[in-house]
Amino acid sequence: MAQPPPDVEGDDCLPAYRHLFCPDLLRDKVAFITGGGSGIGFRIAEIFMRHGCHTVIASRSLPRVLTAARKLAGATGRRCLPLSMDVRAPPAIVAAVDQALKEFGRIDILINCAAGNFLCPAGALSFNAFKTVMDIDTSGTFNVSRVLYEKFFRDHGGVIVNITATLGNRGQALQVHAGSAKAAVDAMTRHLAVEWGPQNIRVNSLAPGPISGTEGLRRLGGPQASLSTKVTASPLQRLGNKTEIAHSVLYLASPLASYVTGAVLVADGGAWLTFPNDVKGLADFASFSAKL
C-alpha cells in the first residue's frame, strides 16, 4: 500500500519535500486561495508554490495571512500576497482581486477553501447559524467565483477548484448546515462548468475526508478512542493529511486535468462509505466539544 507523503500538524511549511509531479508544473501561474492562511488552504498554497506558482492568500484575519505569507515565501522562494477579505462581502472581494491583479497582472487559478463548520443537531441549530454557514460556504464560493469571472477569467480562461465535503452524500448527522452548503457548492460546480466552459474555464470540486492536523478534525472528529475506531473501520484505515489533499487539488488545477470539468473528486480514503453515522454518539461529542 502506498505510504502517505510527509506532513506537519500545524500551520507550518514542510521541512522537506519530494516532488511527485514536475517541479515547474505551475511555473509562473498565479493562484488566488481563500482560506489560505491556515489548515488545508495553507498547505495548498505551499504545494502550489513548490511547483512554481505565485499565490494570493485571503482570509478575514490579516495577522494570520501575514504570518502565513512570510512562512510560505521563505520556504518556497515564490511570491505570496496576503490579503484581508470576507467572502460574504462582494465589495471587499472586488478590492482584493483588483489588488492581486495590480500585483501580478493575472490570476490563473481560484481555490475556494474558506468555510465554517461545527456539530449541531438540526433541531437546536439557530436560524442565524444555518445562514452563516450558507453565507460563507455557498454564497462565498459564488461571490469570489463571479468576481474573478468578471475581472479576469471571462476573457483569459482559468481554473476553479471548490473545496467541499462528502457530508451531503448520505445525510451526515449533526451536519445539516455544512452538508447542505457543500452540496450546493457541488451543484454550483456543475452549473458553472457548463456555463463557463466555452470561455475555457474549468470548474471542479475536491471533497476531502477526515484530515489530520486541521481544525475541522478537532471540532468534528470525536474523542480520540472513538475516532481511532472509525479510522480503523475505513477502507485505508488511516486519516488523510493536508499534503495529500493539496496534491489532489494540484492535479485538478494543473494541465494534467485539462479535460476534467464539472467533476467532484473525493479524497477521503473511502471513509464516507464506512464511517458510522451515529446520531447519539455525535450528539454526545457535540455537547462535550461545545464546552472546550
Curated annotation (Swiss-Prot):
GO cellular component terms, A-Z: peroxisome
Motif (Microbody targeting signal): 290-292
Assembly with partners or alone: Monomer, dimer and oligomer.
Residues annotated as binding NADP(+): 35-40, 60-64, 86, 182, 208-214
Function, as annotated: Auxiliary enzyme of beta-oxidation. Participates in the degradation of unsaturated fatty enoyl-CoA esters having double bonds in both even- and odd-numbered positions in peroxisome. Catalyzes the NADP-dependent reduction of 2,4-dienoyl-CoA to yield trans-3-enoyl-CoA. Has activity towards short and medium chain 2,4-dienoyl-CoAs, but also towards 2,4,7,10,13,16,19-docosaheptaenoyl-CoA, suggesting that it does not constitute a rate limiting step in the peroxisomal degradation of docosahexaenoic acid.
Catalytic activity: a (2E,4Z)-dienoyl-CoA + NADPH + H(+) = a 4,5-saturated-(3E)-enoyl-CoA + NADP(+); a (2E,4E)-dienoyl-CoA + NADPH + H(+) = a 4,5-saturated-(3E)-enoyl-CoA + NADP(+); (2E,4E)-hexadienoyl-CoA + NADPH + H(+) = (3E)-hexenoyl-CoA + NADP(+); (2E,4E)-decadienoyl-CoA + NADPH + H(+) = (3E)-decenoyl-CoA + NADP(+)
Modified residues (N-acetylalanine): 2
GO biological process: fatty acid catabolic process
Positions of modified residues (Phosphoserine): 287
CDD domains given in the database record: TER_DECR_SDR_a
Gene3D superfamilies: NAD(P)-binding Rossmann-like Domain
Main location: other
Top-level taxonomy: Eukaryota, Metazoa, Chordata, Craniata, Vertebrata
Residues modified to N6-acetyllysine: 151, 291
Keywords attached to this entry: Acetylation, Fatty acid metabolism, Lipid metabolism, NADP, Oxidoreductase, Peroxisome, Phosphoprotein
Organism: Pongo abelii (Sumatran orangutan)
InterPro entries on file: DECR2-like (IPR045017), NAD(P)-bd_dom_sf (IPR036291), SDR_fam (IPR002347)
Enzyme Commission number(s) from the entry: 1.3.1.124
Entry protein name: Peroxisomal 2,4-dienoyl-CoA reductase [(3E)-enoyl-CoA-producing]
